[in-house]
Protein backbone atom coordinates (compact mmCIF):
# COMPACT_ATOMS: atom_id res chain seq x y z
CA UNK A 1 0.00 0.00 0.00
CA UNK A 2 1.07 3.59 -0.47
CA UNK A 3 1.94 5.86 2.44
CA UNK A 4 -1.07 8.07 3.28
CA UNK A 5 -1.13 11.40 5.11
CA UNK A 6 -4.53 12.61 6.29
CA UNK A 7 -4.86 16.36 6.68
CA UNK A 8 -7.59 18.98 6.73
CA UNK A 9 -9.47 20.02 3.63
CA UNK A 10 -10.26 23.67 2.85
CA UNK A 11 -7.84 25.05 5.45
CA UNK A 12 -4.11 24.71 6.06
CA UNK A 13 -3.47 22.92 9.35
CA UNK A 14 -0.26 23.96 11.15
CA UNK A 15 0.03 20.48 12.63
CA UNK A 16 -0.42 18.72 9.29
CA UNK A 17 2.21 21.02 7.84
CA UNK A 18 4.64 19.94 10.56
CA UNK A 19 4.24 16.38 9.33
CA UNK A 20 4.45 17.38 5.67
CA UNK A 21 7.75 19.15 6.27
CA UNK A 22 8.93 16.19 8.37
CA UNK A 23 8.10 13.67 5.64
CA UNK A 24 9.88 15.84 3.08
CA UNK A 25 12.88 16.14 5.42
CA UNK A 26 13.07 12.34 5.45
CA UNK A 27 12.65 12.17 1.68
CA UNK A 28 9.48 10.09 1.95
CA UNK A 29 6.75 10.20 -0.67
CA UNK A 30 3.12 9.99 0.38
CA UNK A 31 -0.44 10.36 -0.82
CA UNK A 32 -2.23 13.35 0.70
CA UNK A 33 -5.86 12.81 1.65
CA UNK A 34 -7.66 15.99 2.59
CA UNK A 35 -10.48 15.46 5.05
CA UNK A 36 -13.21 17.82 6.20
CA UNK A 37 -13.46 18.66 9.90
CA UNK A 38 -16.74 16.79 10.12
CA UNK A 39 -15.31 13.71 8.36
CA UNK A 40 -12.35 13.19 10.71
CA UNK A 41 -14.27 10.49 12.65
CA UNK A 42 -14.32 8.37 9.47
CA UNK A 43 -10.52 8.19 9.18
CA UNK A 44 -9.18 4.67 9.74
CA UNK A 45 -12.59 3.44 10.88
CA UNK A 46 -12.80 6.03 13.63
CA UNK A 47 -9.57 5.14 15.43
CA UNK A 48 -8.36 8.76 15.50
CA UNK A 49 -10.01 11.96 16.65
CA UNK A 50 -7.73 14.51 14.99
CA UNK A 51 -5.33 15.03 12.11
CA UNK A 52 -2.65 14.62 10.94
CA UNK A 53 -2.73 10.86 10.70
CA UNK A 54 0.04 8.98 8.92
CA UNK A 55 -0.62 5.47 7.62
CA UNK A 56 2.71 3.98 6.59
CA UNK A 57 3.28 1.47 3.82
CA UNK A 58 3.09 -1.43 6.29
CA UNK A 59 -0.22 -0.15 7.70
CA UNK A 60 1.22 1.42 10.86
CA UNK A 61 -1.02 4.30 11.96
CA UNK A 62 0.37 7.31 13.83
CA UNK A 63 -1.68 10.32 14.91
CA UNK A 64 -0.50 13.83 15.88
CA UNK A 65 2.52 15.64 14.53
CA UNK A 66 5.09 15.06 17.31
CA UNK A 67 4.25 11.37 17.45
CA UNK A 68 4.66 11.22 13.67
CA UNK A 69 8.09 12.90 13.86
CA UNK A 70 9.22 10.44 16.56
CA UNK A 71 7.90 7.53 14.52
CA UNK A 72 9.72 8.70 11.40
CA UNK A 73 13.01 8.99 13.28
CA UNK A 74 12.60 5.50 14.73
CA UNK A 75 11.43 3.82 11.53
CA UNK A 76 13.71 5.67 9.11
CA UNK A 77 16.76 6.25 11.29
CA UNK A 78 19.19 6.13 8.36
CA UNK A 79 17.62 9.30 6.93
CA UNK A 80 18.46 12.77 8.29
CA UNK A 81 17.19 12.91 11.90
CA UNK A 82 14.40 15.22 12.93
CA UNK A 83 14.69 15.13 16.72
CA UNK A 84 18.08 13.56 17.45
CA UNK A 85 21.14 15.26 18.92
CA UNK A 86 19.26 17.37 21.43
CA UNK A 87 16.84 18.70 18.87
CA UNK A 88 13.76 17.56 20.78
CA UNK A 89 14.64 19.87 23.67
CA UNK A 90 15.14 22.69 21.19
CA UNK A 91 11.77 21.93 19.60
CA UNK A 92 10.05 22.02 22.98
CA UNK A 93 11.75 25.33 23.79
CA UNK A 94 10.59 26.96 20.56
CA UNK A 95 7.10 25.47 20.89
CA UNK A 96 6.96 27.18 24.27
CA UNK A 97 7.53 30.50 22.50
CA UNK A 98 5.34 29.79 19.51
CA UNK A 99 2.27 29.04 21.61
CA UNK A 100 1.78 32.41 23.33
CA UNK A 101 3.61 34.57 20.80
CA UNK A 102 2.37 32.86 17.64
CA UNK A 103 -0.84 30.87 17.82
CA UNK A 104 -2.49 32.69 20.70
CA UNK A 105 -1.68 36.08 19.19
CA UNK A 106 -2.46 35.46 15.52
CA UNK A 107 -5.09 32.70 15.41
CA UNK A 108 -7.91 34.86 16.81
CA UNK A 109 -7.10 37.61 14.31
CA UNK A 110 -7.65 35.27 11.36
CA UNK A 111 -10.27 32.96 12.82
CA UNK A 112 -13.11 34.54 10.84
CA UNK A 113 -11.09 34.25 7.60
CA UNK A 114 -10.71 30.53 8.28
CA UNK A 115 -14.44 30.15 8.93
CA UNK A 116 -15.37 32.02 5.77
CA UNK A 117 -13.25 29.69 3.63
CA UNK A 118 -15.01 26.53 4.84
CA UNK A 119 -18.01 24.80 3.26
CA UNK A 120 -21.29 25.26 5.12
CA UNK A 121 -21.21 22.06 7.19
CA UNK A 122 -17.64 22.55 8.34
CA UNK A 123 -18.19 26.27 8.92
CA UNK A 124 -21.02 25.51 11.35
CA UNK A 125 -18.85 23.00 13.23
CA UNK A 126 -15.89 25.37 13.29
CA UNK A 127 -17.95 28.28 14.60
CA UNK A 128 -19.62 26.25 17.34
CA UNK A 129 -16.43 24.54 18.55
CA UNK A 130 -14.18 27.61 18.44
CA UNK A 131 -16.70 29.96 20.04
CA UNK A 132 -17.14 27.43 22.83
CA UNK A 133 -13.36 27.17 23.25
CA UNK A 134 -12.71 30.91 23.34
CA UNK A 135 -15.93 32.06 24.99
CA UNK A 136 -16.54 34.70 22.32
CA UNK A 137 -17.96 34.97 18.82
CA UNK A 138 -15.63 34.72 15.84
CA UNK A 139 -16.49 38.31 15.01
CA UNK A 140 -15.50 39.44 18.49
CA UNK A 141 -12.25 37.47 18.36
CA UNK A 142 -11.16 39.02 15.06
CA UNK A 143 -12.50 42.53 15.73
CA UNK A 144 -10.14 45.49 15.10
CA UNK A 145 -7.54 43.25 13.49
CA UNK A 146 -5.61 46.06 11.83
CA UNK A 147 -5.25 47.85 15.15
CA UNK A 148 -4.15 44.67 16.94
CA UNK A 149 -1.68 43.38 14.34
CA UNK A 150 1.25 45.63 15.35
CA UNK A 151 1.21 44.22 18.89
CA UNK A 152 1.03 40.66 17.55
CA UNK A 153 3.97 41.33 15.25
CA UNK A 154 5.98 42.84 18.09
CA UNK A 155 5.15 39.78 20.17
CA UNK A 156 7.15 37.60 17.77
CA UNK A 157 10.39 39.14 19.05
CA UNK A 158 11.27 36.09 21.21
CA UNK A 159 11.20 33.99 18.01
CA UNK A 160 13.46 36.49 16.27
CA UNK A 161 15.83 36.47 19.23
CA UNK A 162 15.89 32.66 19.33
CA UNK A 163 16.89 32.54 15.65
CA UNK A 164 19.48 35.30 15.97
CA UNK A 165 21.94 35.20 13.09
CA UNK A 166 21.60 31.46 12.52
CA UNK A 167 20.28 30.02 9.28
CA UNK A 168 18.00 27.60 11.10
CA UNK A 169 16.51 27.17 14.55
CA UNK A 170 18.21 23.77 14.72
CA UNK A 171 21.62 25.20 13.84
CA UNK A 172 23.58 24.64 10.66
CA UNK A 173 20.90 22.43 9.14
CA UNK A 174 17.12 22.40 9.45
CA UNK A 175 15.46 19.94 11.82
CA UNK A 176 12.08 19.38 13.37
CA UNK A 177 12.15 22.71 15.20
CA UNK A 178 12.23 24.36 11.79
CA UNK A 179 9.37 22.15 10.61
CA UNK A 180 7.33 23.47 13.55
CA UNK A 181 8.08 27.15 12.91
CA UNK A 182 7.66 26.92 9.15
CA UNK A 183 4.36 25.07 9.61
CA UNK A 184 3.03 27.96 11.67
CA UNK A 185 3.80 30.43 8.89
CA UNK A 186 2.41 28.01 6.29
CA UNK A 187 -0.84 27.99 8.25
CA UNK A 188 -0.92 31.79 8.52
CA UNK A 189 -0.11 32.25 4.84
CA UNK A 190 -2.94 29.91 3.87
CA UNK A 191 -5.63 31.69 5.86
CA UNK A 192 -4.59 35.35 6.19
CA UNK A 193 -6.47 37.95 4.16
CA UNK A 194 -4.31 40.69 5.71
CA UNK A 195 -0.50 40.25 5.70
CA UNK A 196 0.56 39.04 9.17
CA UNK A 197 4.09 40.46 9.07
CA UNK A 198 5.49 43.89 8.32
CA UNK A 199 7.80 44.51 5.38
CA UNK A 200 11.41 44.12 6.45
CA UNK A 201 10.69 41.69 9.28
CA UNK A 202 13.87 39.61 9.84
CA UNK A 203 11.73 36.47 9.95
CA UNK A 204 10.84 36.90 6.28
CA UNK A 205 14.32 35.86 5.14
CA UNK A 206 14.13 32.75 7.28
CA UNK A 207 10.66 31.89 5.97
CA UNK A 208 11.82 32.38 2.38
CA UNK A 209 14.72 29.94 2.94
CA UNK A 210 12.45 27.47 4.68
CA UNK A 211 9.67 27.54 2.13
CA UNK A 212 12.25 26.88 -0.61
CA UNK A 213 13.32 23.62 1.07
CA UNK A 214 12.23 20.25 -0.28
CA UNK A 215 11.53 21.39 -3.83
CA UNK A 216 9.76 24.60 -2.80
CA UNK A 217 7.29 22.77 -0.57
CA UNK A 218 6.27 25.83 1.43
CA UNK A 219 5.74 27.86 -1.70
CA UNK A 220 3.07 25.42 -2.86
CA UNK A 221 0.65 26.98 -0.36
CA UNK A 222 -2.14 29.01 -1.91
CA UNK A 223 -2.58 32.20 0.05
CA UNK A 224 -1.80 35.85 0.36
CA UNK A 225 1.56 37.54 0.97
CA UNK A 226 3.10 37.30 4.43
CA UNK A 227 4.09 40.98 4.31
Question: What does each model-found stretch correspond to?
Answer:
Residues 216-217:
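NAD(P)-dependent Rossmann-like dehydrogenase/reductase catalytic/cofactor-binding core
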Residues 213:
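Metal-dependent nuclease catalytic core centered on acidic motifs
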Amino acid sequence: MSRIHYELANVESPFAWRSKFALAHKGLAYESRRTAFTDIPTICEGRHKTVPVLVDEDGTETCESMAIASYLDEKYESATPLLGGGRQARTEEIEGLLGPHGFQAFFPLYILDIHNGLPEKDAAYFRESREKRFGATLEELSNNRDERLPAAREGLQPLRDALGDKQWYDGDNPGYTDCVVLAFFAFIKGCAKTPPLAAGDPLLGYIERGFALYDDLGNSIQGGPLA
